């Protein structure tokens, strides 16, 4: 059966031929407006259906036999490419219909113009269509507008969509054959169409029993495409499509011309594109691959040619991409943008599309019923919500994407763009005159043809510029210009683009010299483009001056390394010491050289010495002398090779932190060895020095700055002080003020007496910080804060001006630093003046009491505060030969808890309680979370809401004092219930973390040492301190022996004179001395002993007199002035008896001392210190209670005042929780730290290998099976003095003078505060400001420990026995004890430290006794060796504060290190709570007061029955947010 639907087309063509003949004849309406059939329309307007049928030339991905898949220019006909693709996609679609399909065979025969595509799998049904009355294969391949894809309710993931595909191929072929077999219908169908589907051949039907298959064979009508044959380009495109199908269709083998294509999946297919492609560094591109789910597969790599994509939708190659590509790319871009912004802080702003331009993405997707913008299906337009699936890329993929080179590529592009901006804005060209830099004194020849002979002198500040200008009077202004620097310039190696662009100093130097970014100054001609041929650096001869030189060298080396090879840089040195005698004068340019001269000059004391601390010390006359001898003072920097580059990079590159550590470690060790061997220090500037290599400068001069930076920033293990703090202490000891002194005046005194060379403002802040005592500052303030020294409201920033506040030494300070030890210390000398010692030697390690924090070069230090009494007790244990007990961080007057998560990992918890279903009360904030900051950054956003989060609370009220915290917060019931579920501590940000993995301190020999645990610090200190007690005893024995001998001689002399055995009247002096020697009298014993010690007792004797003749040499021979100078009234009976008594007492004192060991001396000092500590604490408490309710006064008003300030007794305390996740995170941090240290090869400090850290951790875990918890509270009679945290940021260690809460608080359920949780002492100096926005710089002066004492409670008379000494939990012998007990026990003191009578106390019979072992982190704070045992107080304030449910009475301990502790039980806790709530509801509302916030303490002053919980309490957990400061 033959049809001829093309007849009208042929007639139309004939009509067109006659057109010329009928040109003049008017066209009829019928010939103008014509109707065509669908088939006619397709042939007449093929571009509507298959794209252009004209040859086009464009860049395409093709497959060439010799190179594989490549991107090249091809000439092809899009229409022909499309009809081939339609058949190929149909074959691939069959995989979605029949998952068992496994093979596609493609045959392309250009010679015979024949293309065949065969696939197995379910075939086309060989059955007659009952409606159309023809077989289905004939229907769908030979009839237009037929398809199986018209049911849009059916979700399909196939390429076919509109019903045109295969028919279009038929129409544009001269011959088109369909062959399909159906196992289901047991038939094989075959039919051929000819002449552009114009004629249909006979249909063949045969019986069939094999597997289904379909084969389409066609011969394209090349004439329609204006082609003669299938050329190389179109075949290359078709072959690539065969590879596409092999890569995008899973589990299908594709054969091309009988050969199987070597593609094993999408990942393998992607590699074909990336073969031989390299990144910017010459390495193969990294590919990130993920099979997200069965419908999505993504690969990503870096692109150097803008955004590139290869994508498939249901096997269709979407060469123009579409929304499926955007959907995936946008996810990746959003993540990469965040990373780039973090790494490019301050650089050129990077936008999303710029990040996308560096990506090459491969996407293979199956999408339900996709839509396209044309029949060519190059761009997929379906919206993402209709994809039928999602593609959520995993964190693993994103992490790999960040590391695959894209981020580096973007950052390189950013640098390139930044460079363009720098060149545009910051580079300079050569001009004769420079405008806009007023402080520049330009050389007259700068910018002229003689510019290479000009030198620019860069000076340290305006005063140095004045010196240089004075000197220019000698050398002239033609060749020398001067420009003053304002302090230290930027480290450009680590600076951001924005910093460099905005740095006026850098830009001025570039402009003055005429430098251009990225220009190479290798040859001499390039130097002629500069306005100056050299830069001369003129700074002070101190370490800060060396740093400025180093920064300038770094600036030139980083941007123009070639300039260093031309000797472009030089320095101008000035003397640091001058000595003169008569008219002779010598200058020294380094202190070691001066010391050498002194040691080789016997009469050096006769020379006048003048020290030059800066350029400003030199006079104009001296400046002219310097410039007149330019050869001596000008030192050129000489480039000696790659070692110079390496040295500069070592000093200033951020990436070489570990190398710098090793560099400084070697320096400190070398310096130590030189001291031990008595060798002089190495120095650079000798009399003959004319040049210097950069390597020498870095390793011999700049390293002194880096070391001094550490010395200024990191305290000593011995006294816990930094040099500035030590100078303050030295001055206070020397002044020994009995009256208070203004801080500003004391600062001036310190600068004078201790030779302090920096600004007095920083000195005043150091003094203030040493005196601060608020919660979170010092546990023991060494100075007294007399005036406003700052509070916890603002973290100390609210201190008054130093002109208005006073201070003086704390009465405890000289007990900590006994004067008897001063003689054993090594004092330093500055400008020939004796100043502070290299360290003091306190009786307890102050670095643990007040903590430490600082950031130096290569190292940083972070140590929390610890409890004073715990430290004292541990020292006593060491003195007794016992092992010290573990300690948790502790902050004076802090009422919250600190818990240990892992070794050196802690979490700090504030206090929150629930008052009723809509009200909570916050009564403590984590350490260093200041009240005002918390209000502004946490509560205000919760009250007002933000753009992203709705309001959480409805109102809050504040009842703080300067020492206490109290927020009463209102919420809806629903919000409060939800907050309880999440955890109130977490919601209200009342947990912060503390990491102590950087306990780095200077040891006693001046070397940095890293400590793994706090007990390592304690043991190091103990060994050294014990040795110095031995030295003290030795010194005292000598001194007492000399004094005893002196008194003995004096008494004997007086007695013999009275008896007439010695006659001194009217005798020559020489004869008298002879008589005394004959009678066996000693020459002055005290003077002789002091001379033997080679130490001069008084500072004044160390100071040289300006008068050269004052060096009087002591008379040779014995001296008896101590006898002969005695007054006559010594001969009286009274004075004689007194002298004999003194002699006997001194002998007794000497004998007593001989019988004491160094340990005895130490224990005595500790006993005296603890006794005075209790006096001071009692006074602090008394001072704080001034104005609070007492015995007199109006009780009601006072109670009302208390109710506002103190925590409500009704509150149900929320127990902070530590989740397993928090512990796991802490362990992960430790593992990560150890791993990073091992990988980076950080040098071990002082022989402590990193492996030992792990061993210590394991050892500690065995030793402390349970997690340790410490509830910080202070007992009323003898508070456990919480180790006051030293302001780690400041130069001073502030001491918390107030050790206890100043007010008594009625008990409430919350008050098992002390025992409520097994709080582990955890605090993270890294993340003290999880939410607070205080910036790190200000924190330098403001880090202080928080108040560690809970509110005191008023207790009825019957409970007023003196409380037990602060009890801390004993070491647990049960590793699982933490998990077993729902109610944490309060820490108790070790059995050994308890007074005998307290150990016999038994628990109340009405209370359930639940024995629990807890890790002993705290030790008895009051009953200590060497102090008098005190009676056990009954229910003191502290007792109630710590245990509102009843005094916790310790069960007698079985072992020293394991103490069983009674667990509180509370059968009625819930009912009690209900009663309390009802009381609140019933209480009368005061005038003008919102009842919601009213808690009347009048009704609740009597404590409720004290009991623990019977039920397991609700636990409120907060995860720690960990931000590392360092």
Swiss-Prot record:
Organism listed in the record: Cricetulus griseus (Chinese hamster)
Biological processes per GO annotation: apoptotic chromosome condensation; chromatin organization; DNA damage response; DNA topological change; embryonic cleavage; female meiotic nuclear division; hematopoietic progenitor cell differentiation; positive regulation of apoptotic process
Additional free-text comment from the UniProt record: Eukaryotic topoisomerase I and II can relax both negative and positive supercoils, whereas prokaryotic enzymes relax only negative supercoils.
Compositionally skewed regions (Low complexity) per UniProt: 1405-1426
Lineage: Eukaryota, Metazoa, Chordata, Craniata, Vertebrata
Note accompanying the cofactor annotation: Binds two Mg(2+) per subunit. The magnesium ions form salt bridges with both the protein and the DNA. Can also accept other divalent metal cations, such as Mn(2+) or Ca(2+).
Assembly: Homodimer. Interacts with COPS5. Interacts with RECQL5; this stimulates DNA decatenation. Interacts with SETMAR; stimulates the topoisomerase activity. Interacts with DHX9; this interaction occurs in a E2 enzyme UBE2I- and RNA-dependent manner, negatively regulates DHX9-mediated double-stranded DNA and RNA duplex helicase activity and stimulates TOP2A-mediated supercoiled DNA relaxation activity. Interacts with HNRNPU (via C-terminus); this interaction protects the topoisomerase TOP2A from degradation and positively regulates the relaxation of supercoiled DNA in a RNA-dependent manner.
PTM-bearing positions, type Phosphoserine: 4, 1105, 1208, 1290, 1292, 1294, 1297, 1327, 1332, 1369, 1372, 1382, 1386, 1464, 1466, 1469, 1471, 1520
Disordered: annotated span: 1-21, 1089-1117, 1180-1217, 1233-1526
Protein name: DNA topoisomerase 2-alpha
Protein residues bound to Mg(2+) 1: 460, 540
Catalytic activity field: ATP-dependent breakage, passage and rejoining of double-stranded DNA
Limits of the Topo IIA-type catalytic domain: 714-1166
N6-acetyllysine: residues carrying this PTM: 1417, 1437
């Amino acid at each position: 059966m033959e049809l001829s639907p093309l007849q009208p087309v042929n007639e139309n063509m004939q009509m067109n031929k006659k057109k010329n003949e009928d040109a003049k004849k008017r066209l009829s309406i019928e010939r103008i407006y014509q109707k065509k059939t669908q088939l006619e329309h397709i042939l007449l307007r093929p571009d509507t259906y298959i794209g252009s049928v004209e040859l086009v030339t464009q860049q395409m991905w093709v497959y060439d036999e010799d190179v594989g898949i490549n991107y090249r220019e091809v000439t092809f006909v899009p229409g022909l490419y499309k009809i081939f693709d339609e058949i190929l996609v149909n074959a691939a679609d069959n995989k979605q219909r029949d998952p068992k399909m496994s093979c596609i065979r493609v045959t392309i025969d250009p010679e015979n113009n024949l293309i065949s595509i065969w696939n197995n799998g379910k075939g086309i049904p060989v059955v007659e269509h009952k409606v159309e009355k023809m077989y289905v294969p004939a229907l769908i391949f030979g009839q237009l507008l037929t398809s199986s894809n018209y049911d849009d309710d059916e979700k399909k993931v196939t390429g076919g969509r509109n019903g045109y595909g295969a028919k279009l191929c038929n129409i544009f072929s001269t011959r088109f054959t369909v062959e399909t077999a159906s196992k289901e219908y047991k038939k094989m169908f075959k039919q051929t169409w000819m002449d552009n589907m114009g004629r249909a051949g006979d249909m063949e039907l045969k019986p069939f029993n094999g597997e289904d298959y379909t084969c389409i064979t066609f011969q394209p009508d090349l004439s329609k495409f204006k082609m003669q044959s299938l050329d190389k380009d179109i075949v290359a495109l078709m072959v690539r499509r065969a590879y596409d199908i092999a890569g995008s269709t899973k589990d299908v083998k594709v054969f091309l011309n009988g050969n199987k294509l070597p593609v094993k999946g999408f990942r393998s297919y992607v590699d074909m594109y990336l073969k031989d492609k390299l990144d910017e560094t010459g390495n193969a591109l990294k590919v990130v691959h993920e099979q997200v789910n069965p419908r999505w597969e993504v690969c990503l790599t870096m692109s150097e040619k803008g955004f590139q994509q290869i994508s498939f939708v249901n096997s269709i190659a979407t060469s123009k991409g579409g929304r499926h590509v955007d959907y995936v790319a946008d996810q990746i871009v959003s993540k990469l943008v965040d990373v780039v912004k973090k790494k490019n802080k301050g650089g050129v702003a990077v936008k999303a599309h710029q990040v996308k331009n560096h990506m090459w993405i491969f996407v293979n997707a199956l999408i339900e019923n996709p839509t396209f913008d044309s029949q060519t299906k190059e761009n997929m337009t379906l919206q993402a919500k209709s994809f039928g699936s999602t593609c959520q890329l995993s964190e693993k993929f994103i992490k790999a994407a960040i590391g695959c080179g894209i981020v580096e590529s973007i950052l390189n592009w950013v640098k390139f763009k930044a460079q363009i901006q720098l060149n545009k804005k910051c580079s300079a060209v050569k001009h004769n005159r420079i405008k806009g830099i007023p402080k520049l004194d330009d050389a007259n020849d700068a910018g002229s043809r003689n510019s290479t002979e000009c030198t620019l002198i860069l000076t340290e500040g305006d005063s140095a510029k004045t010196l240089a200008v004075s000197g220019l009077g000698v050398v002239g202004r033609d060749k020398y210009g001067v420009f003053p620097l304002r302090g230290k310039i930027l480290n450009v190696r680590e600076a951001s683009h924005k910093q460099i662009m905005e740095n006026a100093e850098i830009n001025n130097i570039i402009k003055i010299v005429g430098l251009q970014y990225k220009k190479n100054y290798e040859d001499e001609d390039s130097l002629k483009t500069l306005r100056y041929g050299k830069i001369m650096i003129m700074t002070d001869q101190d370490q800060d001056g060396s740093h400025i030189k180093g920064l300038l060298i770094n600036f030139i080396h980083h941007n123009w390394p070639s300039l260093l090879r031309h000797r472009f840089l030089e320095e101008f040195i000035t003397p640091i010491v001058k000595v003169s005698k008569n008219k002779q004068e010598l200058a020294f340019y380094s202190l070691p050289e001066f010391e050498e001269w002194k040691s080789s000059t016997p009469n050096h004391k006769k020379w006048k010495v003048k020290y030059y601390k800066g350029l400003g010390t030199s006079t104009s006359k001296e400046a002219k002398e310097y410039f007149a001898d330019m050869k001596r003072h000008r030192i050129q920097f000489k480039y000696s090779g790659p070692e110079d580059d390496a040295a500069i990079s070592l000093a200033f590159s951020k990436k070489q932190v570990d190398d710098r550590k090793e560099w400084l470690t070697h320096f400190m060790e070398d310096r130590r060895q030189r001291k031990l061997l008595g060798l002089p220090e190495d120095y650079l500037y000798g009399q003959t020095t004319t040049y210097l290599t950069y390597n020498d400068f870095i390793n011999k001069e700049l390293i002194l700055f880096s070391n001094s930076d550490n010395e200024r920033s990191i305290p000593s293990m011995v006294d816990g002080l930094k040099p500035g703090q030590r100078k303050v202490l030295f001055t206070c000891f020397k002044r020994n003020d009995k009256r208070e002194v203004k801080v500003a005046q004391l600062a001036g005194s310190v600068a004078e007496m201790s030779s302090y060379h920096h600004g007095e403002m920083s000195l005043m802040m150091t003094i203030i910080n040493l005196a601060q005592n608020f919660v979170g500052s010092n546990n023991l303030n060494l100075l007294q804060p007399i005036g406003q020294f700052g509070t916890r409201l603002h973290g100390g920033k609210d201190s008054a001006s130093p002109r208005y506040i006073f201070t003086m030494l704390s009465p405890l300070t000289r007990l900590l630093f006994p004067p008897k030890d001063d003689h054993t210390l090594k004092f330093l000398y500055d400008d020939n003046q004796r100043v502070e010692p290299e360290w003091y030697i306190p009786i307890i390690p102050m670095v643990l009491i007040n903590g430490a924090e600082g950031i130096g070069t290569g190292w940083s230090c972070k140590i929390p505060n610890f409890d004073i009494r715990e430290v004292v007790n541990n020292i006593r244990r060491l003195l007794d030969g016992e092992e010290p007990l573990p300690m948790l961080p502790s902050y004076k007057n802090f009422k919250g808890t600190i818990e240990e998560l892992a070794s050196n990992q802690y979490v700090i918890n504030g206090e929150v309680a629930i008052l009723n279903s809509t009200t909570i009360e916050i009564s403590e904030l984590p350490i260093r979370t200041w009240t005002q900051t918390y209000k502004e950054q946490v509560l205000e956003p919760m009250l007002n809401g933000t753009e992203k989060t709705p309001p959480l609370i409805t109102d809050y009220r504040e009842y703080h004092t300067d020492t206490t915290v109290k927020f009463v917060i209102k919420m809806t019931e629903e919000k409060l219930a939800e907050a309880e579920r999440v955890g109130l501590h977490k919601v209200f940000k009342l947990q912060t973390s503390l990491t102590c993995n950087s306990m780095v301190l200077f040891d006693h020999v001046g070397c940095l040492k890293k400590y793994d645990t706090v007990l390592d610090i304690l043991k190091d200190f103990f060994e050294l301190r014990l040795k110095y007690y031995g030295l003290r005893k030795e010194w005292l024995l000598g001194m007492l022996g000399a004094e005893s001998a002196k008194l003995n001689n004096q008494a004997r002399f007086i007695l013999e004179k009275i008896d007439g055995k010695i006659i001194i009247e009217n005798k020559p002096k020489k004869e008298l001395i002879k008589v005394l020697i004959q009678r066996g009298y000693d020459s002055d014993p005290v003077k002789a002993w002091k001379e033997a010690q080679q130490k001069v007792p008084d500072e004044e004797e160390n100071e040289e007199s300006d008068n050269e003749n004052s060096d009087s040499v002591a008379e040779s021979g014995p001296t008896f002035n101590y006898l002969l100078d005695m007054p006559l009234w010594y001969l009286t009976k009274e004075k004689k008896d007194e002298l004999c008594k003194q002699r006997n007492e001194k002998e007794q004192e000497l004998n007593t001392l001989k019988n004491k060991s160094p340990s005895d001396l130490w224990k005595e000092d500790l006993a005296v210190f603890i006794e005075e500590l209790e006096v001071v604490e009692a006074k602090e408490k008394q001072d704080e209670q001034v104005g609070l309710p007492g015995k007199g006064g109006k009780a009601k008003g006072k109670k009302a005042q208390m109710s506002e300030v103190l925590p409500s007794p009704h509150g149900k305390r929320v127990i902070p929780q530590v989740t397993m996740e928090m512990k796991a995170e802490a362990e992960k941090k430790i593992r990560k730290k150890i791993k990073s240290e091992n990988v980076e090869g950080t040098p071990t400090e002082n022989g402590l290998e990193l492996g030992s850290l792990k061993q210590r951790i394991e050892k500690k875990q065995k030793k402390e099976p349970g997690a340790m918890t410490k509830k910080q509270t202070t007992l009323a009679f003898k508070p456990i003095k919480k180790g006051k945290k030293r302001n780690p940021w400041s130069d001073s260690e502030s001491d918390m003078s107030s050790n206890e809460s100043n007010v008594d608080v009625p008990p409430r359920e919350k008050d098992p505060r002390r025992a409520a949780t097994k709080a582990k002492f955890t605090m993270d100096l890294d993340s003290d400001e999880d939410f607070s926005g205080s910036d790190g710089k200000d924190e330098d002066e403001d880090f202080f420990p928080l108040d560690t004492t809970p509110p005191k409670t008023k207790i009825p008379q019957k409970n007023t026995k003196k409380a037990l000494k602060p009890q801390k939990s004993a070491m647990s012998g049960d590793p699982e004890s933490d998990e077993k007990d729902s109610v944490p026990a309060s820490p108790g003191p070790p059995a050994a430290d308890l007074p005998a009578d307290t150990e016999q106390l038994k628990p109340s019979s009405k209370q359930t006794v639940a024995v629990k072992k807890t890790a002993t982190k705290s030790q008895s704070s009051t009953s200590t060796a060497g102090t008098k045992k005190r009676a056990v107080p009954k229910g003191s304030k502290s007792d109630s504060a710590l245990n509102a449910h009843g005094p916790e009475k310790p069960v007698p301990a079985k072992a020293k290190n394991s103490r069983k502790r009674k667990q509180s039980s509370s059968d009625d806790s819930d009912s009690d709570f209900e009663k309390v709530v009802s009381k609140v509801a019933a209480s009368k509302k005061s005038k003008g007061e919102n009842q919601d916030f009213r808690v009347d303490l009048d009704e609740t002053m009597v404590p409720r029955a004290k009991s623990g919980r019977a039920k397991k309490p609700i636990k409120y957990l907060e995860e720690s947010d960990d931000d590392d400061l360092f």
